[in-house]
Amino acid sequence: MPREDRATWKSNYFLKIIQLLDDYPKCFIVGADNVGSKQMQQIRMSLRGKVVVLMGKNTMMRKAIRGHLENNPALEKLLPHIWGNVGFVFTKEDLTEIRDMLLANKVPAAARAGAIAPCEVTVPAQNTGLGPEKTSFFQALGITTKISRGTIEILSDVQLIKTGDKVGASEATLLNMLNISPFSFGLVIQQVFDNGSIYNPEVLDKTEETLHSRFLEGVRNVASVCLQTGYPTVASVPHSIINGYKRVLALSVETDYTFPLAENVKAFLADPSAFVAAAPVAADTTAAPAAAAAPAKVEAKEESEESDEDMGFGLFD
């Protein structure tokens, strides 16, 4: 079958990306740095039936989206995020589930000299199994060691590389000698596009409990500000009513003015002993039946033992 020319390929690519943007209401913009063709094939196979992965040149993706803005203006939000080595992951499934599947398809990778570290690398304290001739190599990296049974032992954990640092040749060589693969590469979600809205992938970590607690925190903050400024809102009115009632009650106690709800408070302040005396009486009334029941149980037990003896069921008979 003859290979299609470049113009036909471009036309088909534009049609494909437009069709996917229309058919799928949700997608991820993903970074594909350090992802090889073999790993990309594995990702496509593991997510088959759930997602469609589309890669391509940024200029072509932007051109296709700009040409479709008249039909779908919300797609304009995607344009500022199409830069670098990126692609699209289209889906109709739950976004959190697909995110977890993408994370599961990351593969460990060795450190390469000149690469930018995506995470912090710490070498743990351990016996390296390397001979004493490598001691100068560790000293050059500032790693404290000792010779133990003819091999080099690292005495404490060492932060070798910081996030964002360029991996040096010495660091890469050391990690390879220790068989440490500190990095993991895969498709990295940079932005989430969901029914016309675009947001950071961290939003997917928000649970209903988190949203509920944040909402209540906001309500408390609004109520506090409104109470301090005297501006009534639904959040602050209940507190304003309670505070007002407390002030009226305090005024009633200090003056001759009274109302039914204040009578009990005034009576308590006038004679607290009357309320204290009521508690022991209630306790005595509940304790009396229990005390009366105890002798009755003892008497019943004694009668039962006597009847057993009368019937001749003694232990040594």
From Swiss-Prot:
Q: Where is this cross-link: Glycyl lysine isopeptide (Lys-Gly) (interchain with G-Cter in SUMO2)?
A: K297
Q: Which residues carry this modification: Phosphoserine?
A: S304, S307
Give each disulfide bond as a residue pair.
Answer: none
Q: Where is this region: Disordered?
A: 292-317
Its GO biological process terms? cytoplasmic translation; ribosome biogenesis
Query: Where is the crosslink of kind Glycyl lysine isopeptide (Lys-Gly) (interchain with G-Cter in SUMO1)?
Result: K297
Modification Phosphothreonine, positions: T59
Which GO molecular function, any one, fits this protein according to its record?
Answer: structural constituent of ribosome
Q: Acidic residues compositional bias: what residue ranges?
A: 302-311
The alphabetized UniProt keywords are: Isopeptide bond, Phosphoprotein, Ribonucleoprotein, Ribosomal protein, Ubl conjugation
Modified residue Phosphotyrosine is at which positions?
A: Y24
Return the GO cellular component terms, semicolon-separated. Answer: cytosolic large ribosomal subunit
- What does the similarity note say? Belongs to the universal ribosomal protein uL10 family.
What job does this protein perform?
Answer: Ribosomal protein P0 is the functional equivalent of E.coli protein L10.
How does the annotation summarize its subunit structure?
Answer: P0 forms a pentameric complex by interaction with dimers of P1 and P2.
- The protein, known as: Putative ribosomal protein uL10-like
